[in-house]
UniProtKB/Swiss-Prot annotation:
This is Translational regulator CsrA2. The keyword Repeat does not apply. It comes from Pseudomonas protegens (strain DSM 19095 / LMG 27888 / CFBP 6595 / CHA0). One of its GO terms (molecular function) is mRNA 5'-UTR binding. The gene is csrA2. Keywords: Activator, Cytoplasm, Repressor, RNA-binding, Translation regulation. Belongs to the CsrA/RsmA family.
């Protein structure tokens, strides 16, 4: 795992610059981040992604 330190308004770039993650603010133990990615790239919070994956796994296969 790559660990980076960023301040408010600083960003990191993923891949060839198509995905940008920006720190928007820090308040207590919460960090607000913004993700700029192409429409074809799904961006989810981890708990939402896991719920979607679980629902797909539970679908009957034909």
């Amino acid at each position: 795992m790559l660990i980076l330190t960023r301040r408010c308004a600083e960003s990191l770039i993923i891949g060839d610059g198509e995905i940008t993650v920006t720190v928007l603010g820090v308040k207590g133990n919460q960090v607000r981040i913004g993700v700029n990615a192409p429409k074809e790239v799904a961006v989810h919070r981890e708990e939402i992604y896991l719920r979607i994956k679980k629902e797909k796994d539970e679908e009957p296969s034909h």
